[in-house]
Regions:
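Glycine-rich, acidic/polar active-site loops that bind/position phosphate-bearing ligands
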Residues: 1-318
Length: 318
């Protein structure tokens, strides 16, 4: 018997790469997956005269593109930079926004020029309101088949812009799941002859950018919490605002302008139900009188590295 293993990793520019190994035997656990390597000189990660880079498996997923096969998430430098004691008590919910584009780089629905102003597209239905739903639905189904806890999808504020949400427990696990969900999204788009754009402001002008709002909580935030606990966390986030912005994605200044449901990149703010704040306090938290809940960090850009996000949040608040 043989097992098809598809190894997934990040190159020097944090772009996803993959290669396939047909391995002997019925492989079903991480310990059985062989360490492999690739040509790092072709990914800007090694010189040509010393080009072998090791692929170290860290998590397995059922491969939704091939029956009885596995996707292998491999270790990265930023994943290994998470050195605090990781815990399933750290909960993360990423809201990944993105545009689906055609071969020329234009968002779907923009082929004949700029559409009407934003307003009818958010959670819209109908051929004039959305574009690319087949990609979105296929991606959702394949994430479920890969045992990724995708919790929802919706059309976003601009035509051709979408969002999906992924929930995970543990800082490293959350990063693994988000990266693999991105990999599956790009593979699905490939099958539909489309591309995925996760730049934070791909469409200039009066259009929303793309973010990756990050919902997070710890055991103490969910169990017998208090307003004081939440105030302390918010104060720590404010004190470390610059450190967060530094790892919250490239070109995020183009998105965090204080317009289009964002706060200014230069100023930290928070508020109950405020989508124009750096950190939104959700209604569930407020309605519990701050005894249980979570916070939504609205600063991360759509292209941010989730390992960076989980690390800086936990480093800040613990």
């Amino acid at each position: 018997m043989k097992t098809v293993l598809e190894y997934v990793w990040l190159d020097a520019n944090e772009k996803l790469r993959s290669k396939v190994k047909v391995a002997e035997g019925n492989i079903s656990s991480l310990e059985e997956v062989p360490v492999w390597s690739y040509d790092g000189s072709s990914t800007d990660q090694a010189p040509g005269d010393h080009s072998d880079v090791t692929l170290t498996p860290v998590k397995l997923y059922p491969n939704p593109f091939l029956f009885d096969a596995l996707l292998v998430m491999c270790s990265t430098e930023k994943r290994e930079a998470i050195t605090f004691e990781d815990s399933d008590g750290y909960w993360f919910g990423f809201e990944q926004e993105y545009f689906i584009t055609n071969g020329t780089g234009k968002p779907l629905g923009w082929e004949n020029g700029e559409p009407g102003p934003q307003g009818p597209y958010y959670c819209g239905i109908g051929a004039s309101k959305v574009a690319g739903r087949d990609v979105v639905s296929d991606h959702m189904t394949k994430c479920i088949e890969a045992n990724i806890d995708i919790t929802g999808t919706n059309a976003e504020v601009a035509l051709g812009q979408w969002e999906y949400q992924v929930f995970s427990k543990g800082a490293k696990n959350a990063g693994d799941d988000l990266w693999m969900s991105r990999y599956i999204l790009e593979r699905v788009a490939e099958e539909h002859n489309c591309d995925i754009n996760i730049e934070p402001k791909p469409i200039k002008g009066d259009w929303n950018g793309s973010g990756m709002h990050t919902n997070f909580s710890t055991d103490s935030m969910r169990n017998d919490a208090s307003k004081g606990i939440y105030d302390n966390i918010l104060n720590k986030l404010e004190q470390n605002h610059t450190a967060h912005i530094n790892v919250y994605g490239q070109d995020n200044d183009q998105r965090l302008t204080g317009l289009h449901e964002t706060a200014s990149i230069d100023q930290f703010s928070y508020g109950e139900g405020d989508r124009g704040a750096s950190v939104r306090i959700p209604p569930q938290t407020v309605e519990s009188n701050y005894t249980t809940g979570y916070l939504e960090d609205r600063r991360p850009a759509s292209n941010a590295n989730p390992y960076d996000i989980t690390k800086v949040i936990i480093d800040t608040i613990i």
